[in-house]
């Protein structure tokens, strides 16, 4: 799997957020977006995930089977600021829904609901309503969604928000394991993720004049 972004630009309303962003990630590679609030990190992730149309530029997910490209929804998980879980449903019901809805992409096997919750350090709570969990526990379960339906590309927006130091390390290990299996990770964060080998793209937002366009 390869992820290629070429000369991306994006707007929020009338404001130009960033211009000329390009990068390429191959299997086993990670890119971490850093920068101040408002610099465009979340916007770039949403563009790559296919949730926001770019002002210009292209995003291509391609592999040997589909050299012409595949849709972001087929090959990527997007974990945003919101956990995308129903408070009134149990942990198991939420994860079962996502497992059935997303299906499985690629040759790697997805985890069962019980194994996924165990992987994020929360075994034995699948019977509890999601709304009963603490903010940190809810974030862990949201991350477990990535494990119950395989996608080669993980797009993560502040994945360790609301987590303590021990959970940070656990998540870093899960991300490393995904990379070792040939996965790709694109993440935005204010805190170091603790990945051993990752590239960094510092987002500065759009300031000044470029080719006559005022940001």
Swiss-Prot record:
Enzyme Commission designation: 7.6.2.5
Domain ABC transporter stretches: 3-211
The name this protein goes by in its record: Cytochrome c biogenesis ATP-binding export protein CcmA
One GO location term (cellular component): plasma membrane
Signal peptide positions on this chain: none
Gene: ccmA
Any one Pfam family match given in the protein's UniProt record, by short name: ABC_tran
Membrane-protein topology: Peripheral membrane protein
GO biological process: cytochrome complex assembly
Disulphide connectivity of cysteines: none
Alphabetized GO MF terms: ABC-type heme transporter activity; ATP binding; ATP hydrolysis activity
Entry keywords, A to Z: ATP-binding, Cell inner membrane, Cell membrane, Cytochrome c-type biogenesis, Membrane, Nucleotide-binding, Translocase, Transport
Species annotation: Rhizobium johnstonii (strain DSM 114642 / LMG 32736 / 3841)
Similarity annotation: Belongs to the ABC transporter superfamily. CcmA exporter (TC 3.A.1.107) family.
Compartments, record wording: Cell inner membrane
Highest taxon in the source lineage: Bacteria
Catalysed reaction equations from the record: heme b(in) + ATP + H2O = heme b(out) + ADP + phosphate + H(+)
Function: Part of the ABC transporter complex CcmAB involved in the biogenesis of c-type cytochromes; once thought to export heme, this seems not to be the case, but its exact role is uncertain. Responsible for energy coupling to the transport system.
Residues holding ATP: 35-42
Subunit structure: The complex is composed of two ATP-binding proteins (CcmA) and two transmembrane proteins (CcmB).
């Amino acid at each position: 799997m390869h992820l290629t972004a070429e000369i991306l630009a994006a707007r929020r309303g009338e404001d130009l957020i960033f211009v000329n962003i390009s990068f390429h990630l191959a299997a086993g590679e990670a890119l971490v977006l850093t920068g101040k609030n408002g610099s465009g990190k979340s916007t770039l992730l949403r563009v790559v995930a296919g949730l926001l149309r770019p002002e210009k530029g292209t995003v291509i997910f391609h592999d040997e089977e589909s050299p012409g490209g595949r849709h972001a929804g087929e090959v990527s998980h997007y974990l945003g600021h919101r956990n995308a879980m129903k408070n009134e449903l149990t942990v198991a019901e939420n994860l079962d829904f996502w497992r059935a809805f997303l299906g499985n992409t690629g040759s790697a096997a997805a985890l069962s609901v019980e194994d996924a919750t165990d992987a994020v350090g929360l075994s034995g709570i699948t019977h509890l309503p999601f709304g009963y969990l603490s903010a940190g526990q809810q974030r862990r379960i949201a991350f477990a969604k990535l494990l119950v339906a395989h996608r080669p590309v993980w797009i993560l927006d502040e994945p360790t928000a609301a987590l303590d130091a021990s959970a940070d390390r656990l998540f870093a290990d899960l991300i490393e394991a995904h990379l070792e299996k040939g996965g790709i990770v694109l993440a935005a964060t204010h805190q170091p993720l603790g990945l051993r080998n990752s590239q960094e793209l510092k987002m500065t937002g759009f300031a000044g004049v470029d080719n006559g366009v005022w940001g």
